[in-house]
Amino acid sequence: AIAAVITFLILFTIFGNALVILAVLTSRSLRAPQNLFLVSLAAADILVATLIIPFSLANELLGYWYFRRTWCEVYLALDVLFCTSSIVHLCAISLDRYWAVSRALEYNSKRTPRXIKCIILTVWLIAAAISLPPLIYKGDQGPQPRGRPQCKLNQEAWYILSSSIGSFFAPCLIMILVYLRIYVIAKRSNRRGPRAKGASREGKSKQPHPFPAGASSARPPTLTSSLAVAGEANGHSKPTGEKEGKTPEDPGTLTLPPSWPAFPNSGEGQKEGICGTSPEEEAEEEEEECEPQAAPASSASACNPPLQQPQGSRVLATLRGQVLLGRGLGAAGGQWWRRRAQLTREKRFTFVLAVVIGVFVLCWFPFFFSYSLGAICPQRCKVPHGLF
């Protein structure tokens, strides 16, 4: 029964991690540089399932090491190498998540495939530095026990403690601290998000405009009539603000050509913009933005809501960059939403990785804890062989 369960786990591990590698390498949406960590981690798990678990299963079922002694030493070194690599990979992924959340702009510019590959190489070098000492320095092995051969890990206290700290306890501590820090940042971001959004909109609505110094601040400027420069460039003539009943001292109204949609000011109801009278090259744009009024007595159509509305920001952004205010609002809003969506994805991925790492730590902690007790107090704290 144990052999059947372990065999199923071996096949499941190989198949599942192979799918992970295949998905990352073939899917365009998963070709982000940070996903190379998952490819390397999946490769380490496949190596554990193919080169370590089958021989461990045979050793447990037979009760002795059936294979050669040389392979026993290589097998133990590979066991430490692959398992340490898996744990350090998770530590590197947690650090990558932390840098992506806390230093998004700075770190994303450095998160290139080359940089990720260098980090992965460092992870494997750390794992190799922990696993190779038993192959190089074998120490005092003492007399070999009679009977059937056994294949056991290095029993020297210095190696047990150093390998346990480097393979598990240090990476585990780093991951816990990093994910606590990510949680604090995410919680602070959630609290500050709505306030920052409101402050950003308020700041944009009160942003200074390129109007004369005498402009009144009693109400926000509106786009009602045509600009003199724009009107002359387009060959249109339009009454000035004085003919419209405006005083020369009221420069708070910015003018648009007749082909541009009007932005009605609250309480004044200007009807300067005429939908459908624009040139042919701008007809499609204005048809999307303008909706004619249903009033029968009106010969013109009020096209767009006030500037403070999201629709107004979008309309201004379509005026081919000639109205800087609308263009800035659209760009800032789009950038804010892109940033918000990126943070949401980062937080979701961080939560999933936290669950995976938590399960991983719970699985490995009993082994490394009991393994370390053998070096600290080999006689009093000896763990039963069956439990170990």
From Swiss-Prot:
Membrane side Extracellular: residue ranges: 63-72, 141-156, 377-385
An example Gene Ontology CC term for this record: plasma membrane
GO molecular-function terms, A-Z: alpha2-adrenergic receptor activity; epinephrine binding
Residue ranges, compositional bias (Basic and acidic residues): 239-249
TM ranges: 1-25, 37-62, 73-95, 118-140, 157-180, 353-376, 386-388
Biased composition (Low complexity): 292-302
CDD domains assigned to the protein according to its UniProt record, in alphabetical order: 7tmA_alpha2B_AR
Disulfide cysteine pairs (residue numbers): 72-151
Region listing for Disordered, in residue ranges: 193-309
Residues marked Implicated in catechol agonist binding (site): 163, 167
Compartmental location: Cell membrane
Site feature (Implicated in ligand binding) residues: 79
One BP annotation, GO: platelet activation
SUPFAM superfamilies from the UniProt entry: Family A G protein-coupled receptor-like
Xref: Gene3D superfamilies: Rhodopsin 7-helix transmembrane proteins (1.20.1070.10)
This protein's UniProt keywords: Cell membrane, Disulfide bond, G-protein coupled receptor, Lipoprotein, Membrane, Palmitate, Receptor, Transducer, Transmembrane, Transmembrane helix
Ranges in the topological domain labelled Cytoplasmic: 26-36, 96-117, 181-352
Membrane topology: Multi-pass membrane protein
Cited Pfam families: 7tm_1
Functional note: Alpha-2 adrenergic receptors mediate the catecholamine-induced inhibition of adenylate cyclase through the action of G proteins.
Similarity comment text for this entry: Belongs to the G-protein coupled receptor 1 family. Adrenergic receptor subfamily. ADRA2B sub-subfamily.
Subunit structure: Interacts with RAB26. Interacts with PPP1R9B.
This protein's name: Alpha-2B adrenergic receptor
Organism whose genome encodes this protein: Orycteropus afer
